[in-house]
Curated annotation (Swiss-Prot):
Gene: creB
GO molecular function: cysteine-type deubiquitinase activity
InterPro entries in the cross-refs: Papain-like_cys_pep_sf, Peptidase_C19, Peptidase_C19_UCH, USP_CS, USP_dom
Membrane-spanning parts: none
Keyword Acyltransferase assigned: no
Coiled-coil annotated residue ranges, if any: 573-631
Family: Belongs to the peptidase C19 family.
Substrates-to-products reaction catalysed: Thiol-dependent hydrolysis of ester, thioester, amide, peptide and isopeptide bonds formed by the C-terminal Gly of ubiquitin (a 76-residue protein attached to proteins as an intracellular targeting signal)
Region feature Disordered, mapped onto this chain: 1-27, 116-148, 243-268, 514-744
Source species: Aspergillus niger (strain ATCC MYA-4892 / CBS 513.88 / FGSC A1513)
Top-level taxonomic group: Eukaryota
Protein name per its UniProtKB record: Probable ubiquitin carboxyl-terminal hydrolase creB
SUPFAM superfamilies named in the record: Cysteine proteinases (SSF54001)
GO biological process: carbon catabolite repression of transcription; protein deubiquitination; ubiquitin-dependent protein catabolic process
Amino acid sequence: MGSFLRSFRRDVGSSTPSVGATPAKKEPLALPITPLEKMLQEMGSDSVRQDGSDKFFGMENYGNTCYCNSILQCLYYSVPFREAVLNYPTRTPIESLEAALAKNLRYQNFAANQEAEAQAEKQRLANAQRPGAPPAQPPKPEDKDSSEYKKKIALQSLPLLETKNNAGSYGMSESLFTSLKDIFESVVASQSRIGIVRPQHFLDVLRRENEMFRSAMHQDAHEFLNLVLNEVVANVEAEAMKQPIPSLPPADTTDSSRQSISSGSKTPNTTRWVHELFEGTLTSETQCLTCENVSQRDEIFLDLSVDLEQHSSVTSCLRKFSAEEMLCERNKFHCDNCGGLQEAEKRMKIKRLPRILALHLKRFKYTEDLQRLQKLFHRVVYPYHLRLFNTTDDAEDPDRLYELYAVVVHIGGGPYHGHYVSIIKTQDRGWLLFDDEMVEPVDKNYVRNFFGDKPGLACAYVLFYQETTLEAVLKEQEMENMNASAADANEAAVKPNGFPQPAGLAHVHSASQIPVQDEPQRHTGLRRAPTAPQLPTHTEYPGPDIEPSSPAVATPPPVPPIPETANRPLSPKKSDIQSKKERAKEEKERKAAEKEMEKQRRKEQEARVKENQRREEAELKAALEASKASKADEDRRNPTENGKDGDPKRSSNGLSRLKRGSKSFSQRLGKDKESRASSSGLPSVPSAEPLTPNPVPLEPVQQLSPRKASPPKESHVVHKPLGQDDEPDALKSPKGDRAGHGKWRSFSIRKKSFSILS
């Protein structure tokens, strides 16, 4: 393309003679080379692709049509979508396209445009010098680095491609789809690789069929994308209804049918290609909390709109999109199984993944306080490669891998004004910035500038992901590393101050000249990069204009240069990859060590807990044994009166003695009364009958002394120690405690019997 443009410029310069002009005046009118042309020249632009993937045309902005330009560029550089548009219903014959391009493609005369602009400026100044005219403001110098200046130069120098209605050549009636197809076919068939498309015909059809786009107001790019896809589906299905269903070709004519597609003949009227590319299926799962019945409902989508949160990512936004939602109060769910409104849980999952995933970041939110839409400047990180996790269990190809190929950026403070641009990844030329008429190459890291936290009010609004494979990703990374290695090797051959480096020291940089990468994950890798070691602050190789402060020292003869291949500088990217692998390995080992330490710590803690439990159980058992022993000792020393806690045999013996003691005491009283009666001459009183049915032989009871016969104050028996003088007979008695207890019990019964008799 560069050779074509150079020949075109030479023809333009020779065909525009200027009367009385000198060659010196033509120097300022030289056409400046654009960054895109420079990139194409460096990468080799002699071979032109037939599929149109290496055509880079801007689009003219008719007021507020940047929303249309950005979306059309993203759709054009989607290879499957572009091929489907070109092939339905047939490809336009080459002769018809060439005839249309001969009328619609117009090459401009940059020198003539510059001269016309200069004449207009002179006329303006002359009008300002007339008497009575207001003083003219001095013209401001143009900023040649601004996008407005670049767009102006592009409009004056690049070929202009105007599209007309060409629907009759492929047998369709005019519609939004046919106007889109005309743009794609004109760009693909153009012999020029760069230029500017004038989509006036497309905008006319759009405004004719949709009233909302007829005004000059600022429009939403996402709404326009949704409208274009739905209109394309409607136009294609309407056209398919008009045509008869074609019969399937024989199996041996498959190759010939493929050739007929490229030559411009009819293709099978498959109307599902838009659905196969952009359409996905969402499944709404609702579980009733009363009966736990789960109901599912499928929904079709052409793009996913996700809510945003501050300092989040696309993955977290998708996780929130599929989070469970409680349906309660006024939003209760009508359960068919229960037959009424019930509380339920609802969540959204993806059942079928699209081949091209359009993610709409909802940056415009309606606020109740302001009663209008407000733009959200939240930082939302989006990756180059994406895998969706919020899929159903029966999803088709749930592990599909996506790569980012286009970003639509909104620049502005609100939804009602601003500007749209698109950043698109091409097949062989890297990333390009499409800003209406201007097309410029950008670095891959340039895409990271639109997360939402950068100054300038520029935020990513629509993300386009297309399916890819892991092999393609690895191959692309390998190519990027090779290109970066070659570029770094070229830069290392010349010092930044312009002096050539010594041949054997091409890999040495000063401490202030360490190359810094823009990508954040590469900063830590520079510590291990062999291409940039830390050097002392003094200068080892001063330039020719630097005089040493100390006396000159004789230097040895110069060492012969070492071949460059022997000391070829290592690529920073390769060193970065190695350092990343080492860091990943160290991180993995560190995590494994931490995990092992945590596991050991848990084991020690569990062992301490078990030991404490065993010690507590042993202490409790010892306490119980000691309590039992003390209880037995206490029972042995202090037996109870009623015999409940004492020996039952001893208790029964005590009762028998009481019975015997009571009878003997009553008999003795009866005998005394008889003796007194006989002496006094009174009649004898019969003795009381014993209470027990079986009489027990009486035992003689020893006569108690008056001191011992005094009754105790308390009704219960008080046991005194054996060492006291009150019970000398108990120590001498062979029966021990039993005899003693018998005495005291018989004494208490005597007291009671005595009171009864008296």
